[in-house]
């Protein structure tokens, strides 16, 4: 990285000073930023308008749900009835029962906005508790899960939100927070980073629907800047790329800044995400070629190719943010459950992103199949209002276990 000019150095120092403010609710003395604009703080906003995940309900709605067609999906290659019965008898068919359902079907009795816990979720919480082992390490509790078939199946069904931070940490790190890495985090935040100007631009527009990130230069925005600043310095081969802000913001919803930094480092270095962000985006472009190849085995994918809708045109944000603000937050979390458990640096993360992309596109087949380029891009580029997470996850499971190109029954390919 080239040494910044004196003027740029002054700007970098100015940005750092803004995010190093001490948070005092009684005296929010926010200096004037470089561009002369300060995001207003709406003191009238109430936590009553926040859903169970911390997002303001008014910021996302499904008024455009009518744009998407809701019907059953006859196009997937599903296991034959005999195999499904055998799987059901041994408890391996829980998700496949949803595979015919539309991902846009509103599920009766299920609301992602409500804060109360249903009896079904209470049962699932107890099941996750029974799978968790607790060890005392240096006087601290360490939670861990054995990677069994049961764990994988229950993760496809969704981790209860009260277990999410524990499970994600166990899947990805599985150790106590590294004190040396935490010390390094604070050291890095004392240094100047040439990416700070771009990070500062991206911070206020990342996760803006979440109450944690609503106030400029303080709260979650301050933590987000600090984590991204430290990661860019800690992994110079990656530096900072725009999609990283979405990943860090999601982690900060569940973890303190030090742990979010550790999780971010592990995702980039041990789960293959760093390769997607690396200079030149060679790995990302290869991943798009792989997705295009798999899409060629599906009816909806062939239609996308015919109208010139390339994966790079609609899937870049899907891959680099792991579907953050591409699907509803509750759906994103279900995808992330799989990322932490099944992702890996030897192609597993790319395969999971590929399986998820195929599942989303296949779930929209009747919306896409007769649409022109403009309509297709409109459908794929915004926030896709998925309502039936289980229907999407059932499709992801099918594609994760067997990609279209791996299906030996060529005559059944749609």
From Swiss-Prot:
Gene3D superfamilies (alphabetical): putative rabgap domain of human tbc1 domain family member 14 like domains, Ypt/Rab-GAP domain of gyp1p, domain 3
SMART domains hit by this protein: TBC
Keyword annotations from UniProtKB, A to Z: Cytoplasm, Nucleus
Single annotated GO MF: GTPase activator activity
A GO CC term assigned to this protein in UniProt: cytosol
One of the protein's GO biological processes: vesicle-mediated transport
Ranges in coiled-coil conformation: none
Record localization: Cytoplasm; Nucleus
Protein known as: TBC domain-containing protein C1778.09
Location, primary (coarse class): cytoplasm
Record PROSITE patterns: TBC_RABGAP
Pfam family, one: RabGAP-TBC
InterPro entries on file: Rab-GAP-TBC_dom, Rab-GAP_TBC_sf, Rab_GAP_TBC_domain
Domain Rab-GAP TBC: 158-343
Superkingdom of the source species: Eukaryota
